[in-house]
Amino acid sequence: MEYSYPFSTDWSTEEIVDVVQFFEGIEQAHEKGIKREVMMAKYRRFKEIVPSQAEEKTIFREFEEASGYISYPVVKQTKEAADGTIIKIVPKKNR
């Protein structure tokens, strides 16, 4: 699947790379799972670049529209899980 990652023109090249790596972690959590510690490190770096909650929500929405992957459940599970846990989003079955 080809799509563009959301980013700001105000970010440096390094920041853009780090945000793309964060979203690659979101993709991995949806597809095959990612270690909690790895995802948390990616999220912490993302929050250094995007400290505003409102901007985070906007970027998450843009990423979801482009990719179909929802970021919030991954972040929530990452924050709540213990170290050593694999973060994996299981799709909900239609009723």
Swiss-Prot record:
It comes from the Bacteria. It holds the Pfam family UPF0223. It comes from Lysinibacillus sphaericus (strain C3-41). This is UPF0223 protein Bsph_1378. HAMAP family: UPF0223. InterPro entries: BH2638-like_sf, UPF0223. Belongs to the UPF0223 family.
